[in-house]
């Protein structure tokens, strides 16, 4: 059975707290796992969340500030220690290549796994295209070079049993119609409907910019930083971050179905205020104020 869910490993921003670890998010997408922004302590959080090194197929780092990347050293060494049986691909800003190398080879260990380096440069663009999804990136606005990521499942078609019966199509003929697009004068479009592929977006440290909206547009799930509350918007702009209200307005204007707020400044004690401000900004879809070690299902597909 396919599983599509977000496993939240950490939700703090620059400074971890007693209740919030540095960043870390594993997206389970059917049989594949994509680890985003492994901050300090990610390896232990994986253990607590029931995530194994074998679950990781791809690593995506938005930028090289410590709360988003210090966990790379431990995670990479654990992947090799456990002799993960498949290659792992790492995406990260090309401008931070020297940081990646330092973290990859922070200490001595035996390399047993193929780790493919696929850095992101320029405006971003398509990073990977598989039968299951396309992975894109877009440049964000932060004091150091930062990229967000977007995963898009290909659109497919859903066969409609009533229309198949109406045209007398059954058994092996259904497969032939799906393969060839036409059968006995009946086209695939006549007996099916488009099923839109699911879309997932991951947006960390950034001010509002075109890249934020490009990544968020039409997402079934948007995981987005909301470091500050609205009353501290000036701080957010100065330091290259978003407020809860700004993140929620992006989600509202982009047609996001499920908004996941995370990356909270340690200055705030009550996470419910982030939800209050997000609702006040007009977002009325599913909303999760992330906590460490929770699992958030990707919304089920909906038909047009």
UniProtKB/Swiss-Prot annotation:
Top-rank EC class of the record's enzyme: hydrolase
Record text on subunit structure and interactions: Homodimer.
E.C. no: 3.1.26.11
Active site: 67
Protein name listed in UniProt: Ribonuclease Z
Catalysed reactions, semicolon-separated: Endonucleolytic cleavage of RNA, removing extra 3' nucleotides from tRNA precursor, generating 3' termini of tRNAs. A 3'-hydroxy group is left at the tRNA terminus and a 5'-phosphoryl group is left at the trailer molecule
Signal peptide start and end residues: none
Free-text comment on the cofactor: Binds 2 Zn(2+) ions.
GO molecular function: 3'-tRNA processing endoribonuclease activity; zinc ion binding
Domain of life, per lineage: Bacteria
């Amino acid at each position: 059975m396919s599983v599509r869910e977000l496993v939240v490993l950490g939700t703090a921003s620059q400074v971890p707290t007693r209740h919030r670890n540095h960043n870390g998010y594993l997206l389970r997408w059917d049989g594949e796992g994509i680890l985003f922004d492994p901050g300090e302590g990610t390896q232990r959080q994986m253990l607590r969340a029931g995530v194994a090194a074998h679950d990781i197929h791809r690593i995506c780092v938005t930028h090289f500030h410590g709360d988003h990347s210090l966990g790379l050293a431990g995670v990479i060494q654990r992947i090799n220690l456990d002799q993960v049986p498949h290659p792992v691909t790492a995406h990260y800003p090309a401008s931070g290549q020297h940081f990646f190398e330092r973290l990859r080879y922070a200490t001595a260990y035996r390399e047993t796994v193929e780790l493919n380096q696929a850095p992101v440069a320029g405006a971003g663009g398509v990073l990977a295209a598989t039968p299951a999804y396309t992975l894109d990136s877009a440049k964000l606005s932060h004091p150091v070079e930062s990229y967000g990521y977007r995963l898009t499942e290909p659109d497919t078609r859903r066969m409609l049993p009533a229309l198949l019966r109406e045209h007398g199509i059954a058994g092996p003929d259904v497969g032939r119609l799906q393969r060839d697009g036409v059968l006995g004068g009946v086209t695939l479009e006549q007996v099916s409907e488009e099923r839109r592929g699911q879309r997932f977006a991951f947006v960390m440290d950034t001010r509002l910019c075109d890249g934020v909206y490009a990544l968020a547009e039409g997402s079934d799930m948007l995981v987005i930083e909301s470091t500050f509350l609205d009353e501290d918007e000036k701080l957010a702009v100065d330091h290259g971050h978003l407020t809860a209200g700004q993140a929620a307005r992006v989600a509202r204007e982009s047609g996001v179905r499920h908004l996941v707020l995370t990356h909270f400044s340690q200055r705030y004690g009550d996470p419910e205020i982030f939800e209050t401000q997000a609702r006040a900004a007009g977002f009325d879809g599913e909303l999760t104020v992330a906590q460490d070690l929770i699992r958030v299902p990707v919304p089920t597909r909906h038909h047009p």
